[in-house]
Design a protein with these regions (language model features):
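N-terminal acidic, glycine/proline-rich low-complexity segments
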Residues: 21-342
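Bacterial Sec-dependent N-terminal signal peptides
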Residues: 1-27
């Protein structure tokens, strides 16, 4: 009897060890971030969320492409990359993009210009030249050409200019495919922050700053698209009390300093861009998804959804309970320390 018990115990031990040897870990998401950082502070919050996902091994951040013009934007993202401990993430910038220089306080420039009492830059940089960063559509082609088929998720939380230019691009040193062919082959999903589906008379900012580009992307992008519309992020506000009280450990923090520079404190800010990033990283568990269909952009910049089983466009919705849960989740992520600062 004892012999049988010993044999059973050994068998169970082997089974447990064998089970532990099987990894249930999901593969990290290959993500490209597309942002108009420097316009609204929610881009900086969205970047924080992405860096924490990189720290956790949930994301490979292949690159950050910027659709707001000006050297301060690229330099600010370089500061973020460096501060969060990911200095080698490639950057792509835009030239001759949407005219948005006077649309808001440029918190990116405010942080770039910050100095210590000794007159030195307040934040470290990695790049030596912020004027000659690669053009975003070229970086897209380089990154997509090197990626596995249907492996890349793009989170676009600004204007559609870079994505439109990518679709229009031709063969180059990185790929013989056209831009549209390259996207169709390599991209799994595009997640955007754009539009408004509760009120068709609303002309949402990310759309109206480049209406032709938004039209092209929503109507011609060859993979599934999920968009987080204005009405979702407007229900979920990041609290000023968190900015004021939850970062005492950090000293100078480039996201916190940007938040303080963007508007007169204290203010709570809508989380339009973080909601799109959250869906790109964690999927629909926090949201309700619309049915499948088509999204068209009017000449004035309205976004119109038409249901259809053959459509590949969907948009996010949230009720009050979901909004509260997402807000708490954002606070938990954003107030946590980056891996390089624990």
């Amino acid at each position: 009897m004892k012999t049988n018990n010993i044999i059973l115990a050994i068998s169970l031990s082997i089974a447990i060890v064998s089970g532990c040897g099987k990894s249930s870990k999901t593969e990290p998401i290959n993500l490209i971030m597309e942002t108009d950082i420097g316009n609204d502070i929610d881009d900086a919050i969205a970047m924080d969320i992405i860096y924490k996902a990189v720290d956790a091994g949930k994301v490979n951040l292949l690159g950050v492409c910027i659709n707001k013009e000006g050297s301060a934007t690229g330099e600010y993202v370089d500061i973020l990359n460096t501060w969060y401990g990911h200095p080698d993430i490639p950057l792509g910038i835009i030239h001759n993009g949407a005219d948005c220089a006077a649309d808001a306080r440029n918190y990116a420039k405010a942080v770039v210009d910050m100095r210590t009492p000794e007159g030195k830059p307040a934040f470290a940089r990695t790049l030596k030249d912020h004027e000659n960063i690669i053009e975003a559509p070229v970086l897209y082609r380089k990154l997509l050409a090197g990626a596995k088929n249907k492996s890349v998720v793009i989170a676009s939380v600004g204007f559609s200019t870079n994505l439109s230019r990518l679709l229009e691009s031709g063969p180059d040193e990185y790929s013989k495919l056209t831009g549209k062919e390259l996207v169709e082959k390599k991209v799994k999903l595009l997640v955007t922050m754009a539009g408004d589906f509760e009120n068709p008379k609303v002309h949402e900012y990310n759309v109206v700053k480049d209406i032709p580009a938004a039209k092209k992307v929503f109507e011609e992008w060859p993979t599934p698209v999920v968009t987080s519309p204005w009405e979702v992020g407007s229900k979920i506000k990041y609290p000023a009390t968190s900015i004021e009280n939850d970062f005492k450990w950090a000293g100078l923090h480039p996201m916190v300093e940007a938040y303080k520079a963007y508007m007169d404190m204290p203010y709570d800010r809508e989380t339009w861009d973080p909601t799109a990033v959250l869906y790109a990283l964690e999927g629909e568990k926090w949201f309700t998804l619309s049915e499948q269909g088509f999204i068209n952009v009017s000449d004035e910049g309205s976004t119109l959804f038409k249901p259809g089983k053959k459509g590949t466009r969907r948009y996010l919705l949230v009720d009050d309970e979901q909004a509260e849960a997402i807000k708490a989740h954002f606070i938990e992520i954003v107030t946590s320390r980056p891996a390089n600062r624990k």
